[in-house]
């Protein structure tokens, strides 16, 4: 099961609730299967396994909130800090199957951007997250695989290649500018 959430300001709180619920469910499953509560060591292993296994995405792209929706509850600086806190927590707890932010061009397009502008703003926002996380001391290969992208679709011919162009630009920049490994060079995206 994969759970995707379109949340922004409340992202840290809802993510914490989601992860705690997933852990609680696994603890309850252990109790049901074994007829007892887990020991402290067993509980820690259950927590670690759950965080490594849980799958999903949280959109929480504050930059598109500002650019495409003009609905920021927090300042851009504070929001980037919070998203960096989430990415750092993911790194420290080995959360590898959950996308910490889905960088969204869809909302930028809905606000009037053409396909080329949507792509440019979205990739720029992606690199803004990368630079913010690197400035915190995180290593590129620890967080880049947990980024995903979201583009809009339409009838303009540019939409037919938006994904391929985005993947190429991202891969080249990640490899040549940031020295990222092959997994970090992969741009994962959804189009709607």
Task: Give the location of each predicted region.
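Conserved, mostly hydrophobic/aromatic
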Residues: 170
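Catalytic alpha/beta active-site cores
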Residues: 1-153, 158-162, 177-192
